[in-house]
Amino acid sequence: MAAPSYQLLVVDDSKRDTLLLERILQQASDATFTVTHMESAKAGLEELSAQAYDLVLLDYYLPDMDGLAFLEEKQQRGLTAPVIMLTAFGQERLPVAALQAGALDYFRKDQVNSSLLGKAIQQAIEKARLQESAAADAARLRELEETVARLQQQLKEQQKS
């Protein structure tokens, strides 16, 4: 069975950190990752609007907006790619804030390794796909319920005639 292949968008102003992430991802032997890099949040949002990605690896500290503002803007634009947030600095409340803002996971860059990141990416992508599938199923169920209600109403009207 072929290894899964994923399209990733890395939004990070540090080329060095991006190269390090790419090396870490290459070591994740159970998947293939194609990486596109954007150096600012605004460029990342524009790229995400123009191209479909399986996942976004997002640095928290960016020159034009922080990761939480990125997540808010992403949601306002209706962009659905899952996000894993990364930061070089640990802040006590940031992981909770990131998850509440819509990130599916959060890591400090100095704690990331190929096994951890590879698994986190695959799990985040799978979770996002399951959420999309559940939303589609819920929408289909609502449609069916509306159809049943309409048919019941038609049946009642026919029985009266």
What are these regions (language model features)?
Residues 12, 59, 87:
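Active-site residues of response regulator receiver
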Residues 15-36:
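Two-component/phosphorelay signaling modules centered on CheY-like receiver
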Residues 22, 37-55:
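Acidic, metal-coordinating helix/loop segments flanking the phosphotransfer/catalytic sites
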Residues 27, 46, 68-80, 97:
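Short amphipathic alpha-helix used as the core "switch/output" element in two-component signaling
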Residues 40, 66-69:
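Acidic catalytic/metal-coordinating carboxylates
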Residues 63, 91:
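The feature encodes the CheY-like receiver
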Residues 116-129:
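Receiver (REC) domain switch/output surface
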